[in-house]
Amino acid sequence: HGGLDIRGFSRALVSNLQGGDVQGASTLTQQFVKITLQENALKRGDKDAAKAAVDKTYSRKLQELKYALNVEENFTKDQILEGYLNLVYYGDQAYGVEAAALNYFGVSAAKLNLGQSALLAGIVQQPTAYNPVINPKESQARRDVVLDRMQSLGLASAKDVTAAKKVAVKK
């Protein structure tokens, strides 16, 4: 695992310097750092620091990268992923996987089934587009992509994936 995606960072930098669409190149660790900085600032009541944590500036991105490299040195991939999933936005005013599980399914994250877990994993990429409350078809399609990927990685059996896909996502 690495704190910097060199190819993505270079692509985004060139595009941004050429005046094209503003692009990001954040690794999951960089996103975790950004969310953590913003969350800590909000807890302190420091609105300026919360805004600065997400500003689209090169200086902020470099600071984020420095922190991300430090996080990578001091935490395992699993610890970083856990921290990220406990802070990230899942849509519908749900921040963190526990809040999302309760919000969308009425159960704690520990009690999610395979299909529900895959749906929440898929939401993170685009919380509004894949929100099952407002976009159930898109959410279901994304869930199915995640299920297929889980199967291809050996994290779920074909039987379990087929069963999970049979459950429709409803508003």
Residue ranges and their predicted role:
Residues H1-S157:
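Peptidoglycan glycan-strand catalytic modules in the bacterial/periplasmic cell-wall system
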Residues S157-K171:
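Non-catalytic structural connector segments
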